[in-house]
C-alpha cells in the first residue's frame, strides 16, 4: 500500500545557483574540462537540489540532465535522430554512453544540423523537438537515470523519478514523413509500463502538461486506457501544469492512480468536480512560474476546502525551473523585496502551508505574508492609471511601400542582420568593470563606441545593405530596457535556464511603467554617423518585454503591455527625430504567451497586436517598421502577424527547414518578410549550397519584391570568425539570387 505524502514541489532547476552546469557544459564543449568533471558537477548539483527539499516529505528527481528533459526522454527511449547514429558511444567516464549523440542532436555538428528547438508550452524555456517517423521503434535504456536514482536512495533521499509523459512527449514531437506522432501512443504506453516498473521507488511522477491543452476526445480515451494500465504498478503520480486540471481529472480520476497533480494558480482554484477523493490531489497552490509572494491565508483557505473532499498534498503549480534560486543574495529595496518569493522561498511557503494544513500554523510567517500582500496592493507604485490612449493605425501598406521605396532606395533582396553582433570578452569585461566601478561611465561608453566602429566597418566590408549598430551596450534585449524604464527592477543573481547552457536573468516588472529619458537614441546617432547606409533603430516590443520578464499579476497583462507600448512609442518618435528611417521592434516572443486552449487565444491575440500597434503607429508612413520573431509556429498566429502591420517581418526559419513558408503562402502574406537562411543556434558555418537552397525555397513562396535576406536571429552568442564567414555566404547568395531574378526595387 502506497503511503501519501503531504508536501513537495513539481520539479527543481538544474543549472545551479551559480550557473555551475552552464560553465561545466561550456568547458566540456570547448575542451577545457574532461567528461568526468562534467559528470561530477552534474551529480553535485542534483545532490544539492535534493538537499534543498529536506523539509518536504517527497522529493522529485529527474536525474542528471545535461541539456533538456525532452532530449533526456528521447535518449532514454532510444529515439535520438538517426543522422547522429554514426557518432560512437562515449568512453566510460561517468557520462552516459549516448552523450555525444545527445549533444549532437542539441547543438548540431560541422556537418549535421541540430534538432529543432522551440518554447515549452507558453513559457520562456526551450525544448528540443523530438524527430519521429511512422517507422520509429522505441528502444528503452534508462540505465543512467536508474543509477542516479540509486545514488539518491543511498543518500537517504525519499526521491521519486520524474518523467515526461507519453502524451506530452508525442504531442510536442514532429515527424519527418508527415505521419502523426500520436499514432505511437499505445506503443509508448507499453514502453512506459516497463520503464516505471524498473524504478525501486514508492512513487513515480509522470508529467503531462499536454493534458491542460485542447486534446481530441479519441486521444483522451487512449490516455485513460494507457494510464489505467500504468496505475497497476502503484504509486503513479500524474502531474499537470500551465492550466486548469479539470480535463486531466475528467480523464484520469477513478482509474487507480496514486496521485494527480493540478495547477491552482494559472486559472485559479477551479471546481475540480471530477475529483471524488479517491486519489491524492497534489495541489499546486504556490506559483512555480512567477516570483510573487503567496497569499498564505487565501491559499490555506483554498486548501482546507479541498482537504474536506479528500487527501491532498501541497505543491508548486509547476517546476521551479522557471524561477531564480533564492532572494538571499539580492540587494533589492525592502518594500519590493517583501513582495517577492524565489525558489527557496517558495519551498518554504509549501512547507508553511503543509504544516498549517496539519494544524501547525506559523502565525508570524502568515502575518508577515499578509502584510506584504497588503503593502503591494496599496502602494502608489502599483496604483491603477487612467489615461486616454493615442491611435493604433498607420496609412495603408501600399501607400507606405511607395513612400519607403523612394526614401530607402534598397536593392532587390536586401540583406540585413537581426540586431546583435558578438558579445566579445572585451565587451563583457567593460560591462563588468563598469559594474565594479573600476572604469567611469565615459570610459565604458567610449569602449562601446569602439565596438560600434568595428561592427559598422565589418558590415560595410561584407556588403550588407541595411546595417545595425550591433547592440554592444545591451547585456540582454529585455534587461537593457528594463534598467532604463521606471516600474522595473533587475536582480544580481536571478538566473533561470533558457536552454542548454544558456541562462537569462529576467527583470521584474513590479509597478507602473514609464520612460524617464531616451534609451537608444545616442547609440543610433553614433552608428548612423559612421555610414551612408541606413542603420536600423533597435527596440524590443511590448509583448516580448512582458514575456521575458516576471510581470506583475495584479492587473491585466493588456494594461501592462499598453504602458510599455507608450514608453516605446516615445522612443520611436525620438529615433525618427534623430534621423532613423528604419526601426525594428522585435517581438520574438509573441507566440510564447499564446494561451494553451483555443477558447482563450482570441483575447490574447487582440491585446498583443494592439500593444504593438500602439507602440508603432506614431511612425510616419515613409519610416519602415520591422519586427522579428523567433520559435514561432506561424500557422497559429499568422493572421495576427499580418495584423501587426509591420512593413517587414523577419522570422526564424532555417532550423525548421523553412516550414514557415507554407503558412506565409497559404495566408496570402503581402508584407515584407525575411525568413532566416542561417541557423545561428548551431555552432557551424552554413555552406553556400545550404543558404542557396533556403533562399531558393523562399523565392518559390514569396514575391521577390517582399523578400529580405537575413540570419534566423541575433548574433550575440556567436564568435566573429563564424559570423564573418556565415554573413559572407549569405551576402553572396543574395547577390546570385538577384542576378537570377533580374529584378531591382
From Swiss-Prot:
Catalysed reactions, semicolon-separated: 5-methyltetrahydropteroyltri-L-glutamate + L-homocysteine = tetrahydropteroyltri-L-glutamate + L-methionine
Job of this protein: Catalyzes the transfer of a methyl group from 5-methyltetrahydrofolate to homocysteine resulting in methionine formation.
Family annotation (InterPro entries): Cbl-indep_Met_Synth_N (IPR013215), Cobalamin-indep_Met_synthase (IPR006276), Met_Synth_C/arc (IPR002629), UROD/MetE-like_sf (IPR038071)
Biochemical pathway: Amino-acid biosynthesis; L-methionine biosynthesis via de novo pathway; L-methionine from L-homocysteine (MetE route): step 1/1
Keywords: Amino-acid biosynthesis, Metal-binding, Methionine biosynthesis, Methyltransferase, Repeat, Transferase, Zinc
HAMAP family assigned: Meth_synth
Positions of Zn(2+) binding: 628, 630, 652, 713
Active site, UniProt feature: 681
Recorded name of the encoding gene: metE
Family under the similarity heading: Belongs to the vitamin-B12 independent methionine synthase family.
Species this chain originates from: Corynebacterium glutamicum (strain R)
PANTHER family: 5-METHYLTETRAHYDROPTEROYLTRIGLUTAMATE--HOMOCYSTEINE METHYLTRANSFERASE (PTHR30519)
Cofactor annotation comment: Binds 1 zinc ion per subunit.
Residue positions binding L-methionine: 418-420, 471, 586
Gene Ontology molecular function: 5-methyltetrahydropteroyltriglutamate-homocysteine S-methyltransferase activity; zinc ion binding
Alphabetical GO biological process terms: methionine biosynthetic process; methylation
EC number, UniProt record: 2.1.1.14
Highest rank taxon of the organism: Bacteria
Stated name of the protein: 5-methyltetrahydropteroyltriglutamate--homocysteine methyltransferase
